[in-house]
Amino acid sequence: MDVLSCSNNTLKGLYDISGVEVGQHFYWQIGGFQVHGQVLITSWVVIAILLGSASIAVRNPQTIPNDSQNFFEYILEFIRDVSKTQIGEEYGPWVPFIGTMFLFIFVSNWSGALLPWKLVELPHGELAAPTNDINTTVALALLTSVAYFYAGLSKKGLGYFSKYIQPTPILLPINILEDFTKPLSLSFRLFGNILADELVVVVLVSLVPSVVPIPVMFLGLFTSGIQALIFATLAAAYIGESMEGHH
């Protein structure tokens, strides 16, 4: 009976967390459109955290920085280093974009582990990290694609499209396909890792509620940070590639 009870609890946990993805959604009806309310609510919370942190960081800057100012300056330097490494000397205008991507994904990922989303009851579905929803990760990947094309066109004009027939026109279909697979790989990598992390925690909490999930949660925090870094690094690399014009 204990085994059956554990199995039922595990299946219930898996059903609850997967409910965010398989149709148990909370929608807002605005005119003739259905708006995905779950993602908007959690995204607004993440944005509020970022804006609040930014306002604290710039409220009273000191010539001799204190601990909090040092922390935010370190984050800025880190983002600048990532951008410069991947984009090159023309990285400056892209630091805000890469930084926004990195910080939004990082805070979104960590919010899934640290914020008690599931305590908030909704008529349908449940709240979870914004990056736990494929809609969010696809939107972020499409933004990266727009930035990728904008960087290339602003640098080279219509001559940017000549890269599709280099080094030979035979590679035209492959080069076009590559630009479609980039946002797909970005979105599914981020979505899959975050969803898998939460599923593992749910299974372990159902089986061993007290001890085992704790180190797994710490591992999840670490991998969540790594996923944010990977996404931002690849976004910067794609932008740098489009400006340089080589693969």
UniProtKB/Swiss-Prot annotation:
Entry keyword annotation includes Membrane: yes
Keywords, sorted A to Z: ATP synthesis, CF(0), Chloroplast, Hydrogen ion transport, Ion transport, Membrane, Plastid, Thylakoid, Transmembrane, Transmembrane helix, Transport
Transmembrane segments: 38-58, 95-115, 134-154, 199-219, 220-240
One Gene Ontology cellular component: chloroplast thylakoid membrane
Gene Ontology molecular-function annotations: proton-transporting ATP synthase activity, rotational mechanism
Record localization: Plastid, Chloroplast thylakoid membrane
Pfam families from the UniProt entry: ATP-synt_A (PF00119)
Membrane topology (UniProt): Multi-pass membrane protein
UniProt keyword Isomerase present: no
InterPro entries named among the record's database cross-references: ATP_syn_F0_a_bact/chloroplast, ATP_synth_F0_asu, ATP_synth_F0_asu_AS, F0_ATP_A_sf
Family matches, as PROSITE patterns: ATPASE_A
PANTHER family documented for this protein: ATP SYNTHASE SUBUNIT A, CHLOROPLASTIC
HAMAP family hit by this protein: ATP_synth_a_bact
Family per record: Belongs to the ATPase A chain family.
Described purpose of this protein according to its UniProt entry: Key component of the proton channel; it plays a direct role in the translocation of protons across the membrane.
NCBIfam families in alphabetical order: ATP_synt_6_or_A (TIGR01131)
Assembly mode: F-type ATPases have 2 components, CF(1) - the catalytic core - and CF(0) - the membrane proton channel. CF(1) has five subunits: alpha(3), beta(3), gamma(1), delta(1), epsilon(1). CF(0) has four main subunits: a, b, b' and c.
Name recorded for this polypeptide: ATP synthase subunit a, chloroplastic
Organism: Oenothera argillicola (Appalachian evening primrose)
Gene: atpI
